[in-house]
Amino acid sequence: MELDWRSTLSNQERSKYITELAQILADISQINGGARANFDLEKLKKTAEQFETSLYASSSSKELYLDAMRKRIAAMDAAKKKTLANQKQKAAAQRKGFGLAPTLNPQMFLNQQAQARQQARPMRGSVGGGQSPVMMMPQHGVPAHVAHGVPPGVAVSQAKRAQLSLQQQQQINEMKVAEIPRELLQRIPNIPPGVTTWQQVTELAQQKRLTQSDLQIAKQVYQMHQQMMVKSKMQQASLNQLTPQQRAQLQQRQQSTQQSQSAPPQAPQVAQSQQVPAQKPQQQQQQQQQQQQQQQQQQQQQQQQQQQQQQQQQQQQQQQQQQQQQQQQQQQQQQQQQQQQQQQQQQQQQQQQQQHAAAQAQLQHPNAYQQKNMMAQQSAAALQQGQQQPRQMGPQQAREVPNVLNKLNQVFSPAEQKALYENGKKLVQDLQLAGKLPASLTQQQQILYIKKYINQMVLKKLQQNIRLAQQIGAANSANTQSQMAAQAGARFTPGMAQHSQFAQQQHTGNQAQVQSQVSQSISQQQAQLTQKVQQAQQSQLQQTQEQDPQHTQLADSFSQRQFTSPTLAKPSANVSTIAQQQTQPTALSQSHPQQQQGSQAQQQLLQQQQGSQAQQQLLQQQQQQPPPPPPQPQQQTQQPQQPQQQQQPQPQPQLQQQQQLGLQPHQPQLAQAQAQQPQPQQQTQQQTQQQQQQQQQQQQQQTQQQTQHQPQPQLKPQSQQPQPVPQQVQSQQPQQVQSQQQPQPQQLSQPAQQQSQQQQQQQQQSQQQKLRQVQLPQQTPKITLPRPTEQDMMILKRINSEVAKSPLRLSNITNQLTPEQKQMIKNKLQANQQLLSNVDNFIPTLYLITRNEENVRQLLQIRMLAKEIMEHASKGVFIVPPDVVDKVIFRYQKYYEFIKEQLLRRHQQLFSTRQQQMQQQVVQQQQAGQIKLGQNAVGAPQNPQVTTNTDIAMQQQRVQGSFQQMQQQIRQQQVKQAQLQQAQQQAQQQQQAQQLQQGHMPVQQSMPLAGVQTVMATQAATLPQHASPVSSNTANIPKTGDAPVSIDSVTPVPPGIVNSSGPSPVAGKQILAATMVPQHKLSPTKSDFAQAPTADNPYQVDELRLKNLAIRKAEIMSRFKHRQEIFEHSPVDLFLCTLADCMGIKDGSYELLAPIPALMVEQINGTGKKKFTKAQQRVREQDSIECYVKDNKLMMSSKFSADERSYSIHDRDISSCFLDLYGLSDCTSLSFDSSSAEPPTEQVNKKRSHDSLEISPAESDSSLLNDSKKLKVDSPDDLFMTSNMMLDNKNAQPPIGLGLGVGLGEAGSSIWNWNYWESL
């Protein structure tokens, strides 16, 4: 959704907003700076652009982006207007203070006179010729304005003085001649005595008697003096506006204050004729001081008045807020009172109904009434304990918000938790932009605010769950009340008085009534507890809102925020699942072991709900297995069974399936509930169990006595029938069961019908017991996934190799992390160690479920990253921050949850099909049994028990026989598949042998075909009958996170084997090698070579041999490539070095003909100034050999073998390359020793012997030479087989000698001429 709204916003609109913001910022800085405003428009644009990009990234929709941008522009515009208004007010005040009086006062006249004398002074000096050069030009160390006599820091240069206004010029002139106060003058260091004006200070600066630091201090003091002068002028202007009477009063006050206080001593004044006027009367100074004091007093009075007004306004605001709070509190109190009244009314109604029912029950069953009283007393005691706990909380703890973060995993799923975290993060950013939170927050502060937000969410979710529980409890209580009323009305009929002899037997039927009353009392307790919890939470929320304004801002903004995650809006409709989830341990409960006491009432409520559910289940289980009571009429026993059937809880199929799969620890729900019950409820359960056991014993004794006195059979009551375990069978045949359970009062007197009904009931019971025995072990069918085929295994190996080809390159950030972060990473890895280590087990499962290669590739990449993190962390090295570890664990959990969900769905499908089959079989068996029962009832009614027993045994045998037949069919199919696969393997082996014979295979082989066939035969014989041969390939799937071993085998395979489609392991490996050649790197890595399968593998020798051949081939190709690059301008060395490899000559035992360039040597050895790039370094690491140059010798060693590997081939193979060259057939006659060379004339008809040339190992296998023969050296291969042109050119002049300065171009042209080599 974010991409959609961002795509609708064009760049032109964004740039328009940026320019508007920048323009407003420029206007504000111009208003604040005035004519001397100095700002950079580009910087302002960058600032506006940064704000816009942050808003663009954090906004979740276009509306929010536009709204925030408009608000920001409006706020800045209002700020601009406000600053402009303030500037206008200040300008108006300054005009009033500096307004020129119509007549000049004596002080202004003196100032003008001093200014005129100062202007005439430099003119006299210039006319007399006495002007010193120091005065003519500014000093180097003194600023220009100081050199010209202007005070430092504030005055401008002479060029800008013409632009100043009249008021500013007058102010500057006054500052020149004004006397510096003693307090300010003392702050300037290095001032000699007698200096009292700024003119004298400037002269000192011109004479370089003041340092730069002294000048800086002088500038600051000058500014302070200037401010004092401005204030004094403002005070004088205010005095001028006063009436003469007010002036007289002020003078009297000043005189009185001067008399009471000693006047400070005046600083000595040194009058100079050039700067200060000759006469300064003291009266004027006194008047100025008086005026200044008056102005200060007026300012103080004005400030005090303003402060008083502000205080009054604040008090009014506080009073208004208090009134609003009081109103809100009153409203809340009224609402609480209304709720309490409603609750009291409901409780009164319930109490009346209970009293009425209790009175009726007491008349008939005093024992049951006593039990009820005991349970009610115990529940009341438990309720009092729950009420006392919140009262004992301190006042400080009651004000805190209850910490319910430990319930986070019980309320929200991991996806919802992630969405909550993201929403909280965005909310904090929005509040920062809105100015409700500080602009800069540390990570801990940000996490604290996010936790507060999540805590609010969990609290609201729990409140919703409590409300749902209240609604469900109210509905249940209403149903139980209606049932009790119906039962009471049906039970206390006039006709019931006739059956007083069965009063003791009716006691068992009243257990339903006791249960309903117990559940009613429990629901009442729950309702009261929930009300108290809500009241406590409301009071705590109010107190926290008064104390923590930021917390209330978070809560208010959350209530206004719309969440994008759809899962947060789903209310939990099942309260029982919440109770089950609370039993599971959570990570947050471990991180917050100290729970707040504010949530104790809520926990007690949840525990009591669990206890009530467990108690109901216990009573129902006891009712489902009652002792056989004495026979009695069916109408009496039918009524107490109805509430039992209605109160039976529906099972949860999903929870059962999860327990069957073993994905969650199998713990019975009853044991969990009993473990979490409070003590009062446990006591009540124990008492009820004891009483019920006593009643059962009494009833058994009564039944035995009655059966002895009453020999004739009677109809058993319906309450004896136990409920069948499989609910599907019960749902499939409701009509039959109901028809069998319906009473027939008209035919009760007939003994034959009674016997037939009794037989039917016994038969049903026995059938149900047998079905339980058959179905219980089969209710948990194993999840059978389709076996991975050979193609699937190849795909998985290919994906694994592709992922392994791109290794991770993470830097070491151990020094950048804090100890807390390091410990956090270790704790996370240790907590999720089982999840991280079990990834390999469900990678094939993920592919078989999804058939998506991209998902498997992503999971393998995550596995590689997790493995690197764990390996480095075990060594104390950290390569990723903690948030990356969180992301890896979250992705693992996401994949695991997806696989678990898919497996559950598959299990449900298998379970449903199995149930349908069983239901059909049961229905058929019941129909056949009913037909036989009818025949037996008509033909032989005297011995029904024997026939029913035989029928049951026959049915059981049939069921078992059907299961055995199914198992035999499955085994036969598996055996057939194994035989077919073995036949395919034998056919493939035969084809392979034929193709190997046709492909000119060499005679010598390291492992003959017969040996391969014997190994194949033994492996096929060892395979189990019920297993598929393809399962042997499953061992190649990586289980330890490493790359598979057999991926990099690159041996050449005949084309016939590639076309074969059998599941032979050898053929499969060769097919894999042939298909993976163009896709994999030619040089295997050390990890591929070092690792080998740990299990017993009959093909381990072949695999190692093939791997060794692949490495050898890669090294040969790498050596040739290096030589091709280094000997680019020396093909002679290229040919000779390659021939030396074929003959088994070591690298350092021969010398090159042409020297290797120095640049090339530095590049190969890595000693040059130019460093390797990342790509070059990666190529060097992936290379299979190590290459370096030493003493103009190219040395190349293998990375995979410590010893020097020999690349020699047989001499016959070398000589076969030169068969057509003058009839040579043996390579031993060649000599490459240039030291014993003879003149070419004597060497034409001679053949040299080389006895020590047999360097290649004699045990080398010629069948392995196909690889070296198929290597394409960049040379004209056709010239080996033809002898034309160059070979026939016998008149060619022999070269001088390659070791004595022969030209390389000439040698390259005649390299393939045999005469050329003979001339050496």
UniProtKB/Swiss-Prot annotation:
Component of the Mediator complex, a coactivator involved in regulated gene transcription of nearly all RNA polymerase II-dependent genes. Mediator functions as a bridge to convey information from gene-specific regulatory proteins to the basal RNA polymerase II transcription machinery. Mediator is recruited to promoters by direct interactions with regulatory proteins and serves as a scaffold for the assembly of a functional preinitiation complex with RNA polymerase II and the general transcription factors. InterPro entries: Gal11_coact, KIX_dom_sf, Mediator_Med15_fun. It is found in: Nucleus. One of its GO terms (cellular component) is mediator complex. Signal peptide: none annotated. Gene3D superfamilies: Coactivator CBP, KIX domain. Belongs to the Mediator complex subunit 15 family. Residues 245-283, 375-398, 540-554, 588-624, 634-688, 702-780 have a biased composition (Low complexity). The keyword Nucleotide-binding does not apply. Its main location: nucleus. Residues 235-244, 555-587 have a biased composition (Polar residues). One of its GO terms (molecular function) is transcription coregulator activity. This is Mediator of RNA polymerase II transcription subunit 15.
